[in-house]
Design a protein with these regions (language model features):
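Glycine-rich phosphate/pyrophosphate-handling loop used in enzymes and phosphotransfer proteins
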Residues: 1-206
Length: 206
């Protein structure tokens, strides 16, 4: 990996070692990314890999070092890991808070979600908006869960399947409440695709 460019060897290594456990608890998962015991407002989940090593560096460069070109590598990884999706699926980014958009100069997950939608020739819709500017990076699990409940709002959406795209799954609070607001707004079903899963030993305060 040089700068924000992911070489083929690194890319293939991430894909070959893709995340295969339950996105919520890490135990062996059934077909769609959740074990039989875990319940979530999303029906299916996919994850590229654990947030470590090269994948962690790629995400950090994209989020914190303005390495906008890393978007292309992340779209490639999502495209490689996710199976074929039905034509009617709509791709929705988990929105970034406005202060971070101003700081970076772009909404990092909106770019990824739009790029993935274009790659798969699927519809893209920025259906969810941030209702608050709370920053979750570095907060405790309890704080994340409390903040996430008031984090999002969404206008009415047509019935259908919506795929939420986010960068990191830590406690799951963000995508759970984002999925909740989509369902309340009219979505028939919500699926999620995340670039990385925070290692379980570090989920409390990251």
């Amino acid at each position: 990996m040089i700068g924000a460019i992911l070489c083929d060897n690194c890319k293939n290594n991430i894909i070959d070692n893709r995340y295969s456990g339950c996105i919520a608890c890490g135990k062996p998962a059934a077909r769609y990314g959740l074990c039989r015991r875990c319940r979530a407002p999303f029906a299916r989940a996919w994850c590229v890999g654990e947030r470590a090593n090269v994948l962690k560096a790629l995400i950090n460069q994209y989020k914190f070092e303005r390495a906008r070109a890393a978007k292309h590598a992340i779209v490639d990884l999502l495209d490689a890991v996710l199976p074929p999706l039905p034509d009617g699926v709509t791709i929705v980014p988990v929105p970034t808070i406005p202060p971070h958009i101003r700081q970076r100069g772009y909404d990092h997950m909106a770019l990824v979600a739009r790029g993935f939608a274009r790659r798969r020739q699927l519809s893209y819709r920025a259906a969810i908006q941030r209702a608050s500017n709370t920053i979750q990076h570095g907060t405790t699990r309890a704080t994340r869960l409390r903040q996430a409940k008031q984090a999002f709002e969404c206008g009415d959406v047509p019935p259908g399947i919506y795929l939420l795209v986010d960068d990191v799954y830590t406690t799951g609070a963000t995508v759970r409440y984002a999925a909740d607001v989509l369902l309340r707004a009219g979505a028939t079903e919500v699926w999620i695709a995340v670039v990385s899963r925070q290692p379980f030993s570090r989920t409390a305060n990251v």
